[in-house]
Amino acid sequence: MSAIIEAKKQQVDVIAEQLKNSVSTVIVDYRGLTVAEVTELRSQLREAGVEYKVYKNTMVRRAAEQAGIEGLDEFLTGPTAVATSTEDVVAPAKVIAGFAKEHEALEIKTGVMEGSVISAEEVKTVGSLPSHDGLVSMLLSVLQAPVRNFAYAVKAVGEQKEESAE
């Protein structure tokens, strides 16, 4: 086999491994973005711990097949960039959905969450959710509220008894 075909097979294996290991993947059409805008997007994604790469559609198609992900073929037309995260489910969707609001040229094609293909609208919905840390802090705040209110009530009763005793 020629060296080029072997290199392409290795690239497909790398993409397939990336798709298998990612908890969240967003596929976008970046056509119409300037170099500065793409650089800004890459920077934002890097800060969020998201890997962003441009791949040939044929390679992504073969990698998805190898990774056992079905339903991507119809979205793999035109320029395709893939954003993946192995840690935070919300990060790729959040960064890309936010960036797409500011830059209409960026088109969200589809996404993959834990092996299932989701629509562009679902990607935007996931992008509007708080991050894992944000959800945990919200939960803790909700759990703390009754205890905090009880402490305030006990303190108020104590102060009221002190005033009446004086």
Swiss-Prot record:
Any one GO MF annotation of this record: large ribosomal subunit rRNA binding
CDD domains attached to this UniProt entry: Ribosomal_L10
InterPro entries to which the protein is assigned, alphabetical: Ribosomal_uL10, Ribosomal_uL10-like_sf, Ribosomal_uL10_bac, Ribosomal_uL10_bac_type, Ribosomal_uL10_CS_bac
Keyword rRNA-binding belongs to the record: yes
Keywords tagged on the record: Ribonucleoprotein, Ribosomal protein, RNA-binding, rRNA-binding
Function, as annotated: Forms part of the ribosomal stalk, playing a central role in the interaction of the ribosome with GTP-bound translation factors.
Quaternary structure and interacting proteins, as annotated: Part of the ribosomal stalk of the 50S ribosomal subunit. The N-terminus interacts with L11 and the large rRNA to form the base of the stalk. The C-terminus forms an elongated spine to which L12 dimers bind in a sequential fashion forming a multimeric L10(L12)X complex.
Protein name: Large ribosomal subunit protein uL10
